[in-house]
Design a protein with these regions (language model features):
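A recurrent flexible, glycine/aromatic-enriched loop bordering the glycosyltransferase active site
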Residues: 115, 119-144, 161, 167, ...
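Short, acidic, metal-binding catalytic loop of nucleotide-sugar glycosyltransferases
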Residues: 4-13
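Short aromatic/hydrophobic "clamp" motif used to bind/position activated sugar donors
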Residues: 62
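The conserved acidic donor/metal-binding loop of glycosyltransferases
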Residues: 66-70
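Conserved donor NDP-sugar-binding/catalytic core segment of glycosyltransferases
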Residues: 74-107, 111
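Membrane-embedded multi-pass helical conduit in multi-pass membrane proteins
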Residues: 229-263
Length: 263
C-alpha cells in the first residue's frame, strides 16, 4: 500500500494526509499509522478531493500520489531537494508498473502508457535528459508543487471529472511558472487489467477532449491524430476487404523484381 511506503521515507519532516469519505474504512487504516484522515466533504472527483487537501493542510510543499502505488523510500527526498532552486514551481517523475507484481498484460499496458506516441504526448514514462528537465506536464501520481503556486492558480479545476493534473499544470505555466521532471524519482504504479483499462482509456479520451475545449491550447496535433485513429482503422479495414474481393493488387510488374524488369 501507498501508506506503507510513506511510513518509511528517508525524508522525515513530512505530514501525510489521506482524503476520503467520512465513513470509509480507510480512516482506521490511516489513523493506525499515525497519519491524518481528512473528510472529502462529499467530493465526487479527484480534483475536488485534492482541493480539500490543499485547504486543510499548511505545508510549504504539497506532494500528490495515489492509493495504488508502491512508494520508494527516497521519493520525497528526491523531489524535495529541487525546491531549493527558485525556478522550480513543481517537479515530478516517471511512473512504471512494478515488475515483480505485474502480469504480461499489465506489462504490455505499461509499455503503451509510457510511450508518448501512443498517449498523445504524455510523459508518464519519460526519463528526463540529464539531472532535471523542464516539462509541460507532471503525472498526478508523482508530483509536488509549491503551495504558493497552487494557491495562486486557485488549485485544481473544480468539478473536473478527469485530466485535472493536465489543466492544473497548464494554468501554472500560463502564469510563467516552470515545471520539471527528475527521471530518477520513479513511482511504481500498479496497472489495471485489460477490461478496466479499456474503460479507463475511453474515459480519458472523453476528459481530455473536455479539457481541450476548456483550454484550446491543450489540444495539439497529436490529440487530433489519436482522435482520427478509429477512422483510419475503419478505412484500412474497408480497403483491405475491397482488395480481397477484387483479387488483391493486380500490379504484376510492381511485384516483379526479376533482372528483366529492373532498370
Amino acid at each position: 500500500m501507498a501508506l506503507d511506503g510513506l511510513s518509511n521515507q528517508t525524508f522525515q519532516e513530512i505530514d501525510v494526509a489521506v482524503v476520503g469519505p467520512a465513513g470509509d474504512q480507510g480512516r482506521q487504516v490511516t489513523e493506525d499509522r499515525g497519519f491524518r484522515y481528512i473528510d472529502d466533504r462529499g467530493s465526487r472527483n479527484r480534483a475536488d478531493a485534492c482541493n480539500v487537501a490543499i485547504e486543510e493542510t499548511e505545508s510549504e510543499l504539497v506532494f500528490f500520489t495515489d492509493d495504488d502505488v508502491i512508494v520508494p523510500q527516497d521519493w520525497v527526498e528526491k523531489l524535495e531537494r529541487w525546491f531549493q532552486r527558485p525556478e522550480v514551481s513543481g517537479v515530478g517523475g516517471p511512473n512504471f508498473a512494478p515488475v515483480d507484481e505485474s502480469n504480461i498484460w499489465q506489462k504490455s499496458i505499461d509499455v503503451a502508457f509510457c510511450n508518448k506516441f501512443l498517449t498523445a504526448g504524455t510523459n508518464y514514462g519519460r526519463m528526463s535528459e540529464g539531472t532535471l528537465e523542464e516539462v509541460e506536464q507532471l503525472p498526478g501520481v508523482n508530483s509536488a508543487y509549491r503551495r504558493e503556486v497552487l494557491e495562486e492558480v486557485g488549485g485544481f479545476d473544480r468539478g473536473a471529472i478527469g485530466a485535472e493534473d493536465v489543466m492544473l499544470d497548464h494554468r501554472i505555466r500560463l502564469l510563467g511558472h516552470r515545471l520539471w521532471s527528475d527521471g530518477s524519482a520513479t513511482m511504481w504504479h500498479r496497472r489495471r487489467g485489460v477490461s478496466r483499462v479499456r474503460k479507463q482509456i475511453r474515459n480519458y479520451g472523453l476528459v481530455r477532449t473536455l479539457a481541450g475545449k476548456r483550454y484550446p491550447r491543450l489540444w495539439g496535433w497529436s490529440h487530433g491524430l489519436v482522435s482520427a485513429f478509429p477512422v483510419l482503422v475503419c478505412f484500412s479495414l474497408a480497403t483491405f476487404i475491397w482488395g480481397c474481393l477484387n483479387g488483391g493488387l493486380a500490379w504484376p510488374s510492381f511485384w516483379d523484381i526479376s533482372t528483366e524488369t529492373v532498370p
